[in-house]
Design a protein with these regions (language model features):
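Mid-chain, well-packed structural core segment of small domains
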Residues: 73-93
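Small/polar-rich, solvent-exposed N-terminal microdomains that initiate assembly or binding
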Residues: 1-59, 98
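Acidic-leaning, charged glycine-interspersed low-complexity segments
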Residues: 20-21, 25, 92-139
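Short histidine-centered beta-strand/loop micro-motifs
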Residues: 57-62, 83-85
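Residue-level signal for secondary-structure boundary sites
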Residues: 56, 79, 136-138
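Oligomerization/assembly interface segments of phage tail-like spikes and tubes
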Residues: 62-78, 124-135
Length: 139
């Protein structure tokens, strides 16, 4: 797992409110950083994508990266969107305008768009898109 993915995972993993809203997998919170999600994983769970964009954010005196990551939230479709909305809103609260720890980098900006619904056949899904600007330390 990259230092960027680890920073995101750690923020999600260490939040007791989020943990209370999602299932477990192998005795750990059901937060996945690989796809596809294991077939025996039970909803609700959260999936952290790899970067959907990753571009330089360099200056004359610094090296940086601007990355965009999707964090998808899934629940069973019981006819109500409340559960998936609560999980997705919590994910947004954990990242929007919050600084996260990334080994070797200083997190300059974190902002979110969404959550928005994503079409799924068997489950309800919402995605929070998170934009990070990180500056490499020690340059």
């Amino acid at each position: 797992m990259s230092v960027f993915t680890k920073g995101i995972y750690d923020r999600l993993y260490n939040d007791p409110i989020l943990r209370s809203k999602i299932n477990t997998y192998n005795s750990e919170p059901a937060i996945f950083t690989v796809e596809p999600v294991p077939g025996n994983a039970r909803l609700p769970y959260v999936v952290v994508s790899g970067p959907i964009s990753d571009v330089p954010f360099d200056t004359k005196t610094s090296l940086g990266r601007e990355q965009t990551v999707d964090i998808r939230c899934y629940t069973e479709n019981h006819g109500s969107k409340q559960e998936v909305e609560e999980i997705a809103e919590r994910v947004r609260e954990l990242f929007h305008r919050q600084s996260i720890t990334i080994t070797g980098y200083k997190n300059i900006i974190t902002s979110c768009t969404g959550p928005v619904f994503i079409p799924e056949d068997e489950a309800l899904g919402m995605v929070v898109t998170v934009r990070f600007i990180n500056e490499k330390e020690g340059i």
